[in-house]
Amino acid sequence: EELLQKLKLPYHVVVNCGGDLGLGQVKKYDIEAWMPSEKRYRETHSSSYFHDFQTRRLNIRYRDNGTLKFVHSLNNTALATPRILCQIVENYQQEDGSILIPEALRAYMGKDVIRTLS
């Protein structure tokens, strides 16, 4: 969320229902940012909790007061890079075709605006 807040992109957090969970997932959160061309939100980040589903198959355990227990695991997509680039372009594109660079990225881009070629 912090990344999307710094980029000032419209977003929301979705708690997925049981029918949308994949094999072994116990709980899943998605962060979706607005795509103006599609008039809908699209996933940019995902975080899933698997309890011990994956670690049982991998035999990843820890010892708790002498008792072996399986660890619990998470699976996360830190950022869907191609999609977030599209969302930045779409949300920051101006009527003349230029693209404002989000403030948080200006130091890395070395400019404030990407202009169209004339």
Model regions: which residues?
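TRNA-recognition modules of translation machinery and tRNA-sensing kinases, especially anticodon-binding
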Residues: 1-118
